[in-house]
Structures are given as structure tokens and as C-alpha cells.
Amino acid sequence: MESFEVSSIDLKVFGKWDTKVEIRDPSLKKYIGLMPVYLPHTGGRHEHRRFGKAKLPIVERLINNVMRPGRNKGKKMLAYNIVKTAFDIIALKTGQNPIQVLVKAIENSAPREEVTRIMYGGIVYYVAVDVAPQRRVDLALRHLVMGAKEASFNNPKPIEEALAEEIIAAASNDPKSFAIRKKEEIERIALSSR
């Protein structure tokens, strides 16, 4: 019987996409998980560890965000197939690795500043604060998925195509992207309340 070395096995996401991609934003490097996995499903093993979700593959975090609200709640296989088809569409439209396009979209749509409420003497003040890198990734993923769901709601366009278009638009820093518009809105409000 042959023995296999772990380093010789070439794992790719969905059996197609390599996870060796470049992250340009140094603050997000620790929080975008790019370890190679064939099936992005960890079963919530990160849940009880602090910053455990930072080690989760970024594709699984996208799948979990697609699965989260409303009628897709708990249907991970449906969310898995949505993301898999969206990645195929991204590869066809851009000719690039969809994981690289996703990482670029996250970097572009992650807000750097936001507003928090501070109550002082019974008066509420809104103060601009820097956003933690973990929250930046969370907000970027949430806004990408919200934009895709908004684009496909009451529309014949399927969610897979809407998600692919949203990721491509955010990766190219296109203001038509919901995630980019949301980021600019958050940063504009923070700028006005400095």
C-alpha cells in the first residue's frame, strides 16, 4: 500500500480553484482564511474559540452568509451550490481565479471607519471610530451577499448570477456594486461625525 504525503496532495476549492492568492491589504491578511480545503464545511468547530472564524476558509464564510437570513436558513447545500455556480460564472466572465476576485472584492468593500454612539450626560454623540479588521471582513461579506439578494429579489435573474455580478463589480471598485455604495455611505457618515 502506498503512503501519501500531505504536502504532495493538491487540494482545490470545489475541485477547481487554487487558494494561493494575493491579499494586498496587510490588515486583512490574518482574517481572510485561505487554507486549501476540498469541501468548505467545518461544522462550526470554530465557534467557542476567540477569533476562531478568522481561521475559517473565506469561501465557507461566504457560503454561511448566503445561508443566513430568511428562507435559506440552515440550507447549507443550497448555499454551497449557489456559491459554486457563482464562482463558475466569475471564472467565465473574468478569466481569473474566483477566489482572487472574491478577496479583491472584500478588500475594496470593507469599510475603514464607522460611527458608534457615546452617551455623555444624557446626550448621545456619534463618534467616528476605526473598524477592526475582523469586522471589516464580516461587513464586506454581509454587504456582498445583501447586494446579490437585493438584485435577484422580484427579478428573473437567479441569485447565482447576481452574486457573481456583485463580486465582480466590487472587485473592480464599481459604484454600481451595493457593497461599494454601502462602504462609501458608512465612511461618509463617519467623516461627517469626526
Swiss-Prot record:
Q: Which UniProt keywords apply?
A: Ribonucleoprotein, Ribosomal protein, RNA-binding, rRNA-binding
Gene Ontology cellular-component terms for this entry are: small ribosomal subunit
GO terms of biological process kind? translation
List the Pfam families hit by this protein, alphabetically: Ribosomal_S7
Q: Which cysteines are joined by disulfide bonds?
A: none
Matches recorded under PROSITE patterns: RIBOSOMAL_S7
Question: Its family?
Answer: Belongs to the universal ribosomal protein uS7 family.
Task: Describe the subunit structure.
Answer: Part of the 30S ribosomal subunit.
Query: What is the protein's given name?
Result: Small ribosomal subunit protein uS7
